[in-house]
Each structure stands twice: as structure tokens, then as C-alpha cells.
């Protein structure tokens, strides 16, 4: 199975979700000066920022990570977290990334996610990779 790449702000909600998920994952650094590069296809798990619009929905660190053509080329899908208080903007970062990068939006969960979210994502990620061609 290929990897997960995620970003978690200082609130650590996404980090806690990843820990509970128990799947191999690489974190995009919080410090904007630090860079990572991936070498295999991955699913991105990203929190949504802002209060409603598309501007500012995707964290700057994630934008910088995806602006690296090598990293962007290996992206296969996106999962977003958010807050239902933002209504239609709930999980908007996932929508923005899926549209701009031409990958499927796979799942959306609130804040740290529920046990049901953990189970759904674990199962969904496994099934997603099983459906992918070997060299995708």
C-alpha cells in the first residue's frame, strides 16, 4: 500500500486522527522553511482553514508542498478535515485540491474525526490502493 501524507496545524487535530488511523504517514512540516519530497503515490489528508471562501482554505504549507511538481505528480486522492460550523465551506481544502490537481476527493471528517471516520478512512484507503494500477 502507498502512503498517506498529511498536514496538521498546531491544534494537532489532524495529527491525532492520523495516530488513531494507524497507517504509515508522512507529515508536511509546520515550519514553512522545512520541505519534504515524496517518492511514491500518496493520499493527502489536509485540514481546511478560513471561514468560508476558497481563498485561504488550503494551508500555506500544503500549497508549498503541492507547488513542487514532483510531489503534485504523485498525489492520487485527498481527504479533508474541517468544522461543520462553516456550512458549505466544511472541508473546503479537499474540494480545492481535488479540483486543482485533478484527483478524487475521497472523504471528509470533522475536527479529529469519530471512531466511525477512522474505520471508514482505514477501509476506504485500503480499497482505494487495491483498485489502483501497480505503477500509478
From Swiss-Prot:
Annotated S-S bridges: none
Database matches in InterPro entries: Flavoprotein-like_sf, RNR_Ib_NrdI_bac, RNR_NrdI
Biological process according to GO: protein modification process
Induction comment: Induced 2-fold by hydroxyurea.
SUPFAM superfamilies: Flavoproteins (SSF52218)
One Pfam family of this chain: Flavodoxin_NdrI
Taxonomic superkingdom: Bacteria
Gene Ontology MF annotations: FMN binding
Function: Probably involved in ribonucleotide reductase function.
NCBIfam families documented for this protein: nrdI
Family annotation (HAMAP family): NrdI (MF_00128)
Family: Belongs to the NrdI family.
Annotated PANTHER family: PROTEIN NRDI
Protein name: Protein NrdI
Organism: Escherichia coli (strain K12)
